[in-house]
C-alpha cells in the first residue's frame, strides 16, 4: 500500500494520432482499477505538429484533460514548464529527432517503439539522456503487462526448466481484394519508406520483444550475450519489407529465438486459438496467445502431461465506459522510476533497447531494406522538418 499521497506525473503528448489517443485514454483511467495507489497521471499539454486546433480536437476524442494546454508545434510543447515527461507518439521515422528535441529541452521521455530507425540513433538518445540525467524509456508496453511479468517469473523459477527456444510471430492479413497489392496506400506509414514503414519496425518488434524478454533479458547481467542474427525479407513495391523472418542465436547460452512477421497472412485467423508465442524449455513450454502485442491468456504445458491455462484480462474503468487497453502499466512504470530517481527502467534497460535496435537494423540490412538519410541520420537538427512539421 502507498503511504501518503500518490506521486503525480504530468504528461505532455507529442502527436495526436491513434496510438496517442489510446495511450491518453489509459492515462485517464482511475489507477484503482489496476490496483495502483502509489502513482497517478495528469495530461497537462498536447501538441500537433500542424495546428493547435488538431490538439483541441484530440482532447474531445479522448474525452478528458480539457484543461490541458494545446499547441500547434512540438517546440512549444517541450518548452512548457508544467510538463514532467513527453510521450513521443509520432511515426518511427520521427522518433530520433523528436526525442532529441524533448531531451535537449530538459524533458524526460517515453518514446514509442520502434525506438528509432537505426542503432546509432538509439545510442545517441541514451548518451544524451545519461549526460543530462533525464529519464528515457522505449514504450514497449507489452513488457509491463502482469502477464509478461508472471511469465518472466515462471521462467526464472525454472517452471519449464532451461529455456532453449522461443518462437514468436505477429502477422496481419493486409492483402488488397484486388491484385497483389496490400490494402495500404503507398503513402501509408505501414509501407512508406519515408516514414520507416515495413513489417519489421512496426510489427516485428513485438515477436522480438518475446524473444528478448525470455532469452536475453533473463541472462545473468555479468554474462549478457547479444545475438548473432540471420534474417530474410521479401520487399513490397515501395521498398519496405512486407515479410521478414529473424533468427537470433545465443550460442553461449545454447538458446535460439525465431521472430517472424508478415503483412500477407494472419498469425491466427481465429484470433486466440493457437499460440502466437512458444517459449520452450527442458520441462515444458509456455504458450502465449494472440494478440502478440496485447495477450490476454497463456498456457503452461509440462512434459509430464500437466497443463494449465491462465486468463489475464485487462481491467476497464466503468466511469469511462469500460475503457482500459493496457498501456497504463508502462505509464505507471515511468511514474515510479521518476519518483524513485531512476533514469531507466530495469524491465527494459537502455542497453537492451539498443541491442534490439541493432538486431532489427541487421535484419533489415540482410533483407536489403534501406531508408532515406533524413530519417536515418544520428545528427540532431532542431530545425529538421521532422521537428517543425514543415515538409
Swiss-Prot record:
EC number in record: 1.1.1.179
Alphabetic keyword roster: NADP, Oxidoreductase
Keyword match NADP: yes
Superkingdom, taxonomy of origin: Eukaryota
Gene3D superfamilies the record matches: Dihydrodipicolinate Reductase, domain 2, NAD(P)-binding Rossmann-like Domain
EC class (word): oxidoreductase
Catalytically driven reaction(s): D-xylose + NADP(+) = D-xylono-1,5-lactone + NADPH + H(+)
A GO term, aspect molecular function: D-xylose 1-dehydrogenase (NADP+) activity
Keyword Oxidoreductase: yes
Family assignment from sequence similarity: Belongs to the Gfo/Idh/MocA family.
Described purpose of this protein according to its UniProt entry: NADP-dependent D-xylose dehydrogenase catalyzing the oxydation of D-xylose into D-xylonolactone. Also displays some, albeit lower activity with D-glucose, D-galactose and L-arabinose as substrate. Probably not involved in D-xylose degradation, as it has been shown that H.jecorina assimilates D-xylose via D-xylose reductase and xylitol dehydrogenase, and it is unable to grow on D-xylonic acid as sole carbon source. May play a role in the regeneration of NADP(+) in the presence of D-xylose.
Name of the protein in its database record: D-xylose 1-dehydrogenase (NADP(+))
Upper lineage: Eukaryota, Fungi, Dikarya, Ascomycota, Pezizomycotina
Amino acid at each position: 500500500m502507498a503511504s501518503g499521497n500518490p506521486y503525480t506525473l504530468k504528461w505532455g503528448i507529442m502527436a495526436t494520432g491513434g496510438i496517442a489517443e489510446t495511450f491518453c485514454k489509459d492515462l485517464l483511467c482511475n489507477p484503482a482499477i489496476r490496483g495502483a495507489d502509489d502513482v497517478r497521471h495528469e495530461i497537462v499539454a498536447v501538441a500537433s505538429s500542424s495546428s493547435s486546433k488538431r490538439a483541441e480536437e484530440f482532447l474531445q476524442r479522448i474525452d478528458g484533460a480539457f484543461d490541458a494546454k494545446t499547441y500547434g508545434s512540438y517546440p512549444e510543447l517541450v518548452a512548457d514548464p508544467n510538463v514532467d515527461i513527453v510521450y513521443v507518439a509520432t511515426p518511427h521515422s520521427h522518433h530520433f529527432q523528436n526525442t532529441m528535441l524533448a531531451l535537449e529541452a530538459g524533458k524526460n521521455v517515453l518514446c514509442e517503439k520502434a525506438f528509432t530507425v537505426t542503432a546509432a540513433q538509439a545510442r545517441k538518445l541514451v548518451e544524451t539522456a545519461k549526460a543530462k540525467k533525464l529519464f528515457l524509456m522505449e514504450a514497449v508496453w507489452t513488457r509491463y503487462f502482469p502477464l509478461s511479468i508472471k511469465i518472466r517469473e515462471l521462467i526464472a523459477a525454472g517452471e519449464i526448466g532451461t529455456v532453449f527456444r522461443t518462437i514468436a510471430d505477429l502477422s496481419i492479413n493486409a492483402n488488397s481484394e484486388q491484385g497483389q497489392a496490400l490494402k495500404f496506400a503507398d503513402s501509408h506509414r505501414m509501407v512508406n519508406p519515408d516514414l520507416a514503414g515495413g513489417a519489421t519496425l512496426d510489427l516485428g518488434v513485438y515477436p522480438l520483444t518475446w524473444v528478448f524478454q525470455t532469452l536475453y533479458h533473463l541472462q545473468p547481467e555479468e554474462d549478457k550475450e547479444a545475438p548473432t542474427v540471420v534474417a530474410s525479407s521479401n520487399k513490397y513495391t515501395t521498398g519496405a519489407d512486407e515479410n521478414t523472418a529473424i533468427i537470433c542465436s545465443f550460442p553461449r547460452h545454447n538458446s535460439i529465438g525465431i521472430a517472424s512477421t508478415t503483412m500477407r497472412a494472419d498469425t491466427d485467423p481465429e484470433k486466440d486459438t493457437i499460440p502466437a508465442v512458444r517459449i520452450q524449455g527442458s520441462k515444458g513450454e509456455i504458450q502465449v496467445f494472440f494478440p502478440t502485442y496485447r495477450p490476454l491468456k497463456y498456457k503452461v504445458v509440462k512434459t509430464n502431461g500437466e497443463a494449465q491455462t491462465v486468463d489475464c484480462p485487462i481491467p476497464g474503468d466503468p466511469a469511462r465506459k469500460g475503457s482500459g487497453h493496457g498501456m497504463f502499466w508502462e505509464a505507471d512504470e515511468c511514474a515510479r522510476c521518476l519518483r524513485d530517481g531512476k533514469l531507466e527502467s530495469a524491465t527494459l534497460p537502455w542497453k537492451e533497447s539498443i541491442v534490439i535496435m541493432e538486431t532489427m537494423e541487421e535484419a533489415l540490412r540482410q533483407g536489403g531494406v534501406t531508408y532515406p538519410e533524413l530519417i536515418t541520420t544520428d545528427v540532431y537538427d532542431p530545425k529538421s522538418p521532422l521537428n517543425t512539421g514543415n515538409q
